[in-house]
Regions:
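Condensing-enzyme catalytic core mediating Claisen C-C bond formation in acyl metabolism
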Residues: 1-27, 129-201, 205, 209
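Short acidic capping loops at alpha-helix termini that bridge into adjacent secondary structure
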Residues: 9, 48-54, 81-83, 111-113, ...
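Conserved catalytic cysteine-centered active-site region
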Residues: 10-14, 18-32, 60-113
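Buried hydrophobic positions in well-ordered alpha/beta secondary-structure cores of metabolic enzymes
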Residues: 11, 41, 52-55, 73, ...
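Phosphate/pyrophosphate-binding loops at sites that engage ATP/ADP/AMP, CoA/4′-phosphopantetheine
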Residues: 37-53, 209-226
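Acidic, glycine-rich active-site loops and adjacent beta-strand->loop/helix elements
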Residues: 58-63, 89-92, 117-122, 160-162
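Glycine-rich phosphate-binding loops at beta-strand->alpha-helix junctions
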Residues: 58-64, 225-241
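Flexible, glycine-rich active-site loops centered on histidine and acidic residues
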Residues: 106-140
């Protein structure tokens, strides 16, 4: 069934995206995808749930406004000795969470920290809006952070925020500024709104600037880099960077 006026060729040419995964199981939410990540991490590393000290979940699609999705994941995973919290930073969320988690390890405060990025974007995407529905899908991933004596880890991080661009990518209603009403729901104001051109420009400029800054701060050049792993919302953004 065709939902918007587009084709696979049009989408692929402009975004590089071939498919989007959607969580369709009734009653399943972001925490369920996060739980699967935790289970796989614990199994892969031979770690018991009660050994986890902290779980950080980067998400803009929490199961509910509160409690934190991280705490729901911990409960479902049986990690009774851990505490958790969410980070809401959208596309930058996993990097923010990874840097935060690494600092808890480096400080010596905790030994085992799980960092998850998880979103059920299908819950907040308008599938009649071509500017957003062709981009977003559902998914989750994560890492288990532990101390090591080999000098490996997060070498450096530069994190930035620019709230002045919020008018170009946001949700119009549903928060404390404009609580949900029958009118806001009817007007589809609880879905993602995006103005693509300024978002594209900001993404390219921001990534290039930050990459150059972190290289310069560590006395490195692009010739020293084997891999650049960017945010993957759009192939044209990646190619421009």
């Amino acid at each position: 069934e065709k939902m918007v006026d587009t084709t696979d060729e049009w989408i692929t040419t402009r975004t590089g995206i071939k498919e989007r995964r959607i969580l369709r199981t009734p009653g399943k939410a972001t925490s369920d995808m996060g739980l699967e990540v935790v289970r796989q991490l614990l199994e892969k590393t031979g770690t018991k749930p009660e050994e986890i000290d902290l779980l950080i979940c980067a998400t803009v699609t929490p199961d509910t406004t509160f409690p934190d999705t991280a705490n729901t994941i911990l409960d479902k995973a049986g990690a009774k000795n851990a505490f958790g919290f969410d980070i809401n930073a959208a596309c930058s969320g996993f990097l923010f969470a990874l840097t935060t988690g690494s600092k808890f390890i480096e400080s010596g405060m905790y030994k085992k920290v799980i960092v998850i990025g998880a979103d059920k974007m299908s819950a907040i995407v308008d599938y009649s809006d071509r500017s957003t529905c062709i981009i977003f899908g559902d998914g989750a991933g994560g890492v288990l952070l532990e101390p090591n004596t080999e000098g490996n880890g997060v070498i450096d991080a530069i994190l930035k925020s620019d709230g002045s661009g919020r008018e170009f990518l946001h949700m119009k209603a549903g928060g404390s500024l404009k609580p949900a009403t029958p009118e806001t729901v009817a007007n589809k104001e609880h879905f993602v709104f995006q103005d693509g051109k300024p978002v594209f420009k900001a993404a390219v400029t921001g990534m290039v600037t930050t990459v150059n800054q972190v290289l310069a701060r560590n006395n490195m050049t692009t010739e020293d880099i084997d891999w650049l792993v960017p945010h993957q919302a759009n192939m044209r953004i990646i190619n421009s960077v």
